[in-house]
């Protein structure tokens, strides 16, 4: 079997669909790492890596998963399909890519060549270039990920006829669907014949979900949360999907799981257009994840180009975002935008962050990756991937990979200690202690009670004099600017507070800003204006509904249309689509 299933005794996660439950065995991991050891140790220079590729032409390297996939080393100069390609326009950020070779598949006793070209970027990032679609696929973030999970994340693998199907049960339903998978009307009729049947929908490396086959969009009233939606909202959801696809489409089924109460809880909808291209509609939002993994309700993007690819890959393109292509092409195909792996430190190998001394020692890093105690039989992942702090603890305890000693500062009567190699320990120079402040700048002065009595008497006299001045009505004289001498009081504590009060400083509570209106005045709305606003909104919603209904009817009744014309509609019209349509899929209040 090309993948390992760990279904017996697997731990229970909070969301079991978000965790891989399979990876390569330790023997397979060592085989992949051993084959790519020369490439791993040459990553410091692009020229050295190209020389390595030229010196190892036609050498076959294992790719792990699937077990019969290999890399045949070839330089890029021998591939004519790469001469006119500008990969900088495809990838999210400028990155130098070095061609390593082509992917081949072992069938019986010979290798069958594919069109997939394997390239390597910075930090041993591995990309797959597919010339037929002019796309780049992120195969692995680094070589360690390739050795552990192989090509499992690469969608191009599931377009090859040699890849086995992940979805097989029930056999009669799957065989019947695959038989009519290239004819839209025949496939829709086949789904209608098996209405309500459950398919064990598998995604490689993930736990299976239930795909409930449904005849039409109106049949969703038997599934949660659509059973609580009124008929008008259900029709609005159907119109929104049509306005996104810009052509006639059909419903394949709902993907979800059965709850304890017996009802079917829907997470995704799988639909296909008149050209047998399959898409997913997000029903349940997932906002508690990082931005590359967030899924918003109402999002629609392509899952597969055929039913065979859908039953091989499952929901792989829902879980990962690793496809890079031109922006217009992505909008035409309704593809999900790939996340950028060049910004965060997560794109690099996490174990290189703990010790800068081995940052360029790739031979030592390779030994660290291939150590014998990295994998444990009772775990579904390597222990340093679950708890990265154990890397630092292991290095401190063992001390066999890096040794760090801080220079010891010398005391007043100590001399430099010469080591065995004749090198002297560096002398650490300390700063001189700060100069003590004057007595008048000391903030911790003990207050004098006699001075406080004098200050309070002076304060009372100032208040009486201020009242007399107010009664007389005479304006106080302002001093000239040139003769003003700043009075700086350096006393602290209670003396400073009393001095400010004696000087007649106003408190901060008296300072306020004139906002130009009365805050205590009650806000009064004109009910006539409010009713007029609601009436305008109601008319706008009614106009949007009628316009959408006319467009949907035109798409449903058109006899012939090419796929290129439909893709042109998506590029030109989907950008102007009202955001009110996507709100029809907002069922957050019905999910727990």
From Swiss-Prot:
Keywords: Virion, Virion tegument. It is found in: Virion tegument. It comes from the Viruses. The keyword Electron transport does not apply. Residues 407-491 are annotated as: Disordered. One of its GO terms (cellular component) is viral tegument. Pfam families: US22 (PF02393). InterPro entries: US22-like. Residues 460-481 have a biased composition (Acidic residues). Disulfide bonds: none annotated. Its main location: virion. Belongs to the herpesviridae US22 family. This is Protein US23. The gene is US23.
């Amino acid at each position: 079997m090309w993948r390992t299933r760990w279904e017996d005794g697997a731990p229970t996660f909070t969301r079991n669909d978000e965790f891989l439950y399979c990876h390569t065995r330790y023997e397979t991991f060592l085989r992949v790492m051993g084959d790519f050891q020369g490439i791993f140790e040459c990553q410091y220079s692009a020229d050295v890596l190209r020389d390595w590729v030229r010196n190892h032409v036609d050498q076959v390297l294992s790719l792990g998963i699937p077990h019969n996939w290999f890399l045949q080393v070839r330089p890029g100069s021998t591939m004519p399909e790469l001469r006119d390609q500008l990969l900088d326009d495809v990838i999210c950020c400028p990155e130098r890519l070095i061609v390593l070779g082509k992917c081949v598949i072992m069938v019986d006793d010979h290798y069958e060549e594919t069109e997939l070209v394997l390239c390597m970027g910075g930090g041993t990032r591995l990309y797959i270039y597919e010339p037929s679609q002019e796309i780049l696929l992120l195969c692995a973030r680094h070589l360690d990920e390739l050795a552990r999970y192989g090509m499992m994340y690469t969608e191009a693998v599931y377009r090859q006829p040699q890849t086995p199907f992940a979805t097989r049960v029930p056999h009669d339903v799957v065989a019947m669907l695959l038989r009519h998978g290239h004819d839209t009307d025949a496939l829709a009729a086949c789904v209608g014949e098996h209405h309500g049947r459950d398919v064990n929908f598998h995604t490689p490396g993930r736990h299976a979900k239930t795909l409930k086959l449904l005849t039409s969009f109106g049949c969703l009233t038997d599934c949660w949360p659509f059973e609580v939606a009124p008929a008008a909202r259900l029709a609005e959801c159907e119109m929104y999907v049509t306005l996104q696809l810009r052509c006639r489409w059909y419903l394949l089924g709902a993907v979800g799981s059965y709850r304890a109460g017996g009802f079917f809880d829907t997470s995704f909808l799988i639909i296909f257009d008149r050209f047998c291209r399959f898409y997913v509609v997000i029903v349940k939002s997932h906002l508690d994840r990082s931005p590359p993994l967030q899924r918003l309700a109402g999002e629609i993007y392509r899952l597969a180009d055929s039913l065979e690819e859908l039953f091989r890959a499952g929901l792989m393109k829902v879980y990962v975002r690793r496809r890079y292509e031109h922006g217009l092409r992505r909008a035409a195909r309704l593809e999900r935008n790939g996340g950028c792996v060049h910004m965060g430190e997560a794109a690099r190998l996490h174990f290189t962050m703990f010790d800068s001394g081995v940052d360029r020692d790739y031979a030592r890093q390779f030994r660290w990756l291939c150590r014998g105690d990295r994998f444990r039989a009772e775990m579904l992942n390597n222990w340093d991937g679950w708890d990265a702090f154990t890397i630092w603890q292991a290095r401190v305890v063992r001390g066999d990979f890096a040794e760090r000693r801080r220079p010891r500062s010398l005391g007043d009567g100590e001399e430099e200690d010469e080591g065995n190699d004749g090198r002297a320990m560096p002398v650490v120079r300390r700063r001189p202690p700060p100069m003590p402040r004057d007595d008048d700048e000391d903030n911790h002065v003990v207050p004098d009670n006699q001075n406080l009595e004098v200050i309070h008497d002076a304060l009372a006299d100032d208040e009486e004099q201020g009242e007399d001045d107010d009664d007389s009505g005479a304006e106080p004289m302002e001093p000239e600017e040139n003769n003003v001498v700043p009075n700086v009081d350096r006393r602290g504590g209670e003396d400073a507070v009393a001095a400010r009060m004696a000087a007649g400083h106003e408190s901060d509570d008296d300072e306020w800003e004139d906002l130009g209106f009365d805050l205590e005045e009650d806000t009064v709305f004109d009910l006539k204006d409010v009713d007029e606003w609601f009436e305008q909104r109601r008319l706008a919603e009614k106009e949007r509904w009628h316009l959408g209904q006319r467009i949907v009817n035109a798409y449903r009744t058109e006899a012939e249309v090419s796929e290129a014309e439909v893709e042109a509609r998506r590029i030109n019209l989907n950008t102007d689509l009202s955001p009110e349509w996507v709100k029809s899929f907002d069922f957050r209040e019905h999910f727990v």
